[in-house]
Amino acid sequence: MSSIKRILVVHDGTADLERVAEALKKHCSDASVIIRNGVDFTATDLLPADAFFFGCSSPKPASFAELERVLKGINLAGKPCGLFTLEGEKSVLYLRSIVKDADLAVNFATHISSSVKKLGAWVSETLEGR
């Protein structure tokens, strides 16, 4: 994780996912972590980041419209990416679909829970590219 200096976390604005995003930040003490509600996300947030975490509580939240648009037209060259959600398969499939064109190194293990108990290991695995 030493080469990862800046991490971008984008969530859909729900209270539970905002709490997960804040907890995620605590597990990245060696990096600068920027947390954005999807409605506040801009394309310029992506390029300076060395790693990404994207989370939504249900598929296709309105707050992710700009994130979806930008990820379709950018190559992020294998940078690490973790996906988190409160819901099961539909949200996971949605999140995977929006990152597929960006050439990110997505952690296959998605964090599906509002619980932050096992978050540290998942964050480490994601940032190490496992």
Segments predicted by a language model, with ranges:
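FMN-binding flavodoxin-like domain, especially the glycine-rich phosphate-binding loop
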Residues: 2-10, 15-38, 43, 48-130
